[in-house]
């Protein structure tokens, strides 16, 4: 079964609501984020979402223009840093409080729209 953004969000909410799971998983997640290094290149987590699928394209079209331009700038800057094998200075790294999901709400909205459309397309009228 392929993972959907909705199922991933529900799993994350469940983990955060369960104290025992949160106590174990959250520190591991923070360490994973630190080791992945995307914040050291000025990226935010939603910048890493694959944009080659229809759902992501829909979410990107719904993104406000200023956020879209900022996203493109961060990605281009990260590519340049990658090509030159450098990282940003520590004061320019993305801070955890700045790494908020800006694309995820649009992805969830687009996914709900696709699901609703599919349900309506397959609707059978009973008499």
Swiss-Prot record:
Pfam families: UCR_14kD. Signal peptide: none annotated. Keywords: Electron transport, Membrane, Mitochondrion, Mitochondrion inner membrane, Respiratory chain, Transport. The keyword Mitochondrion applies. The keyword Chaperone does not apply. Its main location: mitochondrion. GO terms for cellular component: mitochondrial inner membrane; respiratory chain complex III. It is a peripheral membrane protein. Component of the ubiquinol-cytochrome c oxidoreductase, a multisubunit transmembrane complex that is part of the mitochondrial electron transport chain which drives oxidative phosphorylation. Component of the ubiquinol-cytochrome c oxidoreductase (cytochrome b-c1 complex, complex III, CIII), a multisubunit enzyme composed of 3 respiratory subunits cytochrome b, cytochrome c1 and Rieske protein, 2 core protein subunits, and additional low-molecular weight protein subunits. The complex exists as an obligatory dimer and forms supercomplexes (SCs) in the inner mitochondrial membrane with cytochrome c oxidase (complex IV, CIV). Belongs to the UQCRB/QCR7 family. This is Cytochrome b-c1 complex subunit 7.
